Amino acid sequence: MQLQEVRWRYYLYSLTETQGLIAPVWVLVLQARGLSYTDIGFLGALYWAVLVLAEIPTGYIGDRIGRRRSLFIAALVTAGGVGGLAFARTLLSFALALTAWAVGITFRSGTADAWLYSALGRSGIADAYTHVRGRGRAVKLAATAITAAIGGVLYTKSLVAPFFLIAGLLAVNAAVVLSFPTVSDGQEHSRSESWRFSTTRQELTAAFERPGIRGFVGYTVLLFGLVEVTRTFVQPIVVGDQVGLPVAAVGALYACFNIVAAGASALTSRIEQTLGVRRWFLLGPLLLAGSLVILPLVPAATVPAFVGMEAIWHVSQTFQSRIVNDRTRNRRRATVLSVVSMGGGVAAIAFRAVGGVLADTVSPLLMLALLALVFVVGSGVLFTVTSGTVFRTTETDISQ
């Protein structure tokens, strides 16, 4: 398959993957159905717990049954979960819908990246991965920005309309996946040997024993934890006394997040060429942490800091995926990427739990500053471990 064909199919997949219509309103639906903040907190924890627990099994299934089938299942299961939210009325029914939503996401997590990398590699153009994935992320983020703004308005007309529309869009996403070619992912190997769980465990161990890879994954997982706890408190911070935005402006703010992140994603390959991956991870995440550290002293910097955070994270995520892909054997690629995603989920749970306690004890802005300092210390150690090893491009790894 030629680069242009892979690229446009991936862009269409990214476009129909967006769930922007429900991003700014799904918590409002929970409140409208009479759920308490305790119930909402429980559902959020349940969602992340399912993400973490399902990552390895669904990643393994993705490698076992093929990436196209895994992505097809992801679209259908996610559509069912999102549609279920429209019908849910009780805590149990919301829990079941969110569980389906999370499981669907884990079927996609890592698998879409693994498919893209393999499809490009089969055509001898694996070096285009950063460019294509970055542009694909930009397409998705731009679509999310537009639909987020629409979703806020649509919600005022119909409580459930955004959920039904996203479920329909995900059905289109499933149809797009069916147009993907099947990419060889190592299934020509003996199934009696290659797909044993013991073999998978051995190959996962081998992947994470490569020089610097554990430290690098730890660095990016720690970064994700900081990003996730910040995202959790965006709405109470910007609507509260410290910033004072009207509630109606929050949808526009979320659209701004996605527009800026889309622009940054589109420039990922240029950042790689001009700045380099090593310098990016030395400067970008530390700039993010520094912007959070100053918030208790300069609350006016809150909105720019949150916008900048989204841009920095999306570029970092693409580079993370590229580095892990480069150093992972083809037939276990989705499984390894799912392990990385699982690590991010664990960090998200930990940061959110600690962040909630600290926010009640001090204040949300001071909590973010304290956790940003924790990140600076931890990332400094991990970056020292990875520097000079994992950031070296190894073409032999790419071809495996």
Predicted regions and their residues:
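Helix-to-loop junctions at the C-terminal end of transmembrane segments
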Residues: 54-66, 155, 263-277, 359
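Pair of pore-lining "gating" transmembrane helices in MFS-fold secondary transporters
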Residues: 1-35, 99, 209-230, 307-311
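C-terminal ends and interior cores of transmembrane alpha-helices
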Residues: 76-90, 95, 286-299
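A single, central transmembrane helix in multi-pass transporters
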Residues: 22-23, 39, 159-164, 206-264
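Transmembrane alpha-helix termini and helix-breaking/packing motifs in multi-pass membrane transporters
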Residues: 32, 91, 144-166, 236-245, ...
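Cytoplasmic helix-loop-helix junction between adjacent transmembrane helices
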Residues: 98-142
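Juxtamembrane intracellular "pre-TM" segments in multi-pass secondary transporters
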Residues: 1-3, 178-219, 240, 400
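Multi-pass alpha-helical transporter architecture, strongest
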Residues: 171-180, 350, 367-400
